[in-house]
Amino acid sequence: LSDHALPEETGPYILVSSTTEAMKKIAAFYRTQLSCKVVGITGSVGKTSTKEMIASVLEQRYKVLKTEGNFNNEIGLPLTIFKIRAKHEVAVLEMGISDFGEMHRLAAMARPDIGVITNIGLCHLENLGTRDGILQAKTEMFDHLQVDGTVILNGDDDKLSTKKEVNGKPVIFYGVGADSAFDIKKDIYATDIENHGLEGMCAKIHTPPVSYTHLRAHETGAYLV
């Protein structure tokens, strides 16, 4: 791709008015040709850690492609999508934004089957104004969720807990502890968190009706649960 004419010795190329826009359109088309499931992850903080943990769990059973580093913007996301091959069963894609409309453009490429939002914090207030503005911008992801898609939200976040339904389907909420300060029921929650410093942490992960599963993670900081 090039937005200007190149010398003949350069070889074949496609002349476009904007290489960035062309790349996004090609990525969106390529996504329609893929059969793998896509997990889209966003949030004010914790995107990359959450992406790494989700990919690590899924890799125990599936062929997974994940966003490398934080290639999560309008250039990094299409480059990641182009790496998906027929062998991949799941793609875990991180999406980062700083203004309105960006998530709309990212999600139009990713078309996630599962959408995960970690939290609504105070990042990029210079463009988004308030936490309600951040909520609005992040949840643009839902406009491009697959028809049978699933939304997973942090039930301990006061803003995200207001989103009880998306496209007429109930949201899956997760959090720490069974009780909620908001009017929701947590579907997945952690209890008995033990922080062992550099040796990692332990917790019980409850997924009713199953009682719980023991979790041991080699991560420092109980907040990562």
Describe every region a protein language model picked out.
Residues 1-25:
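N-terminal leader/targeting and accessory segments in enzymes
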Residues 2, 7-11, 116-216, 222:
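Acidic, Mg2+-coordinating active-site environments of NTP-dependent enzymes
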Residues 13-15, 32-38, 92-99, 183-191, ...:
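Short, mixed-charge, low-aromatic patches
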Residues 14, 65, 172:
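General small-molecule cofactor/ligand-binding pocket signal
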Residues 18, 69, 176:
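Active-site donor-binding loop signature of nucleotide-sugar glycosyltransferases
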Residues 21-155, 159-169:
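Phosphate-binding loop of NTP-binding sites
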